[in-house]
Amino acid sequence: MKFIDESLIRIEAGDGGNGCVSFRREKFIPKGGPDGGDGGDGGDVYLQADENLNTLIDYRFNKRFAAERGENGRSSDCTGRRGKDIILPVPVGTRAIDNDTKETLGDLTQHGQKMLVAKGGYHGLGNTRFKSSVNRAPRQKTMGTPGEKRDLLLELMLLADVGMLGLPNAGKSTFIRAVSAAKPKVADYPFTTLVPSLGVVKVDDSHSFVVADIPGLIEGAADGAGLGIRFLKHLERCRVLIHLVDIAPIDGSNPADNMAIIESELFQYSEKLSEKPRWLVFNKIDTMSDEEAEERAREIAEQLGWEEDYYFISAATGKNVSPLCRDIMDFIIANPREAETQQVAPEEVKFKWEDYHQERLAEHQFDDDEDWDDDWSEEDDEGIEFIYKP
């Protein structure tokens, strides 16, 4: 299945139904009171996280989603039916952004989490609502309000504990194949990895972590070179970054310069991301002796001013890979993920009595001269009358 991590869609909540102007007319009640019902509220649009999805491909071609409009009110005090909501399933880790204002509406980071992204319009009022002691035959109603409409940008950000950084052909995909059951493509040419991939690393029977592999970065990626930096967003939720460095590049380049390129591109993308914990791992030590690998790594670290620990591995042969995974697991256990902001559970949608309706009722509350009508019976002064028919 094609990996799609961005999609722009149009969402439209339902409009509110209009109120009804009606009067009770029966065989022996020729001049009954007002009985026009309210309209129904418009349907809402929700996003809901689904752990069974891993791509936004469902929204690649279907671009418009509209909730149902609320029905208009009817006579006999019948309230219009509320419009049906629509719930759009998205992968866990999806972020919703208003494309016009660039406002982030929220992140869906847990299975089943639901988020309101477009609110339906409020219902209009029927003429029964305008009945009073001085307005006994009201012929006023209100219209339903329009529902929210917006262009919504969906961004999928993979939820992983560990993110892999490095130039093309540094051995990131080979590393993931060595430590997990994931099988990303591996070849001897740059940009073999074209889309992000996830692998679950099982350290023991009770501990595991998720590692994310993204396409390699090159110099100028922040300006669009190579595959650009569009995939770096998948590392924003990682707890630690593994910077994989080819200790002996086949093109003869300086590994220290290669590391500086990655650091520069990372900083240009996001200062916050560049400040995440980052571990230095030298790969492909199977191409030389252990003594030569240690000496070369020490020289590279001195050139960079790297004062923290670093690791030597061979992803192809599996050498020193297990100790690295155990240290990563210990770090993850010692540094639990910060609690995600809890989304407030959506309340049950009920009929709203908002200022919109109150203001319109006030406009007609004391219009003695204009609204007086003798088309009423004495029973109408008792308020809203509900008629029950067998």
From Swiss-Prot:
Sample GO molecular function, one term: GTP binding
Biased composition (Acidic residues): 366-382
OBG-type G domain span: 160-333
UniProt function note: An essential GTPase which binds GTP, GDP and possibly (p)ppGpp with moderate affinity, with high nucleotide exchange rates and a fairly low GTP hydrolysis rate. Plays a role in control of the cell cycle, stress response, ribosome biogenesis and in those bacteria that undergo differentiation, in morphogenesis control.
Enzyme Commission number, as recorded: 3.6.5.-
Cell location: Cytoplasm
UniProt xrefs under PANTHER family: DEVELOPMENTALLY REGULATED GTP-BINDING PROTEIN-RELATED, MITOCHONDRIAL RIBOSOME-ASSOCIATED GTPASE 2
Annotated positions binding GTP: 166-173, 191-195, 213-216, 283-286, 314-316
Assembly: Monomer.
Species in which this protein is naturally found: Haemophilus influenzae (strain ATCC 51907 / DSM 11121 / KW20 / Rd)
Top-level taxon of the source organism: Bacteria
GO biological process terms held by the UniProt record: ribosome biogenesis
Obg domain sequence ranges: 1-159
NCBIfam families associated with the record: Obg_CgtA, PRK12297.1, PRK12299.1
PROSITE patterns with a match to the protein in the record: G_OBG (PS51710), GTP1_OBG (PS00905), OBG (PS51883)
Needed co-factor(s): Mg(2+)
Binding sites annotated in the UniProt record for Mg(2+): 173, 193
Xref: HAMAP family: GTPase_Obg (MF_01454)
Protein name per UniProt: GTPase Obg
Pfam families: GTP1_OBG, MMR_HSR1
Gene3D superfamilies listed in its UniProt record: GTP1/OBG domain, P-loop containing nucleotide triphosphate hydrolases
Annotated InterPro entries: G_OBG, GTP-bd, GTP-bd_Obg/CgtA, GTP1-OBG_CS, GTP1_OBG_dom, GTP1_OBG_dom_sf, OBG_GTPase, P-loop_NTPase
GO cellular component term, pick one: cytoplasm
Keywords: Cytoplasm, GTP-binding, Hydrolase, Magnesium, Metal-binding, Nucleotide-binding
Keyword Lipoprotein on entry: no
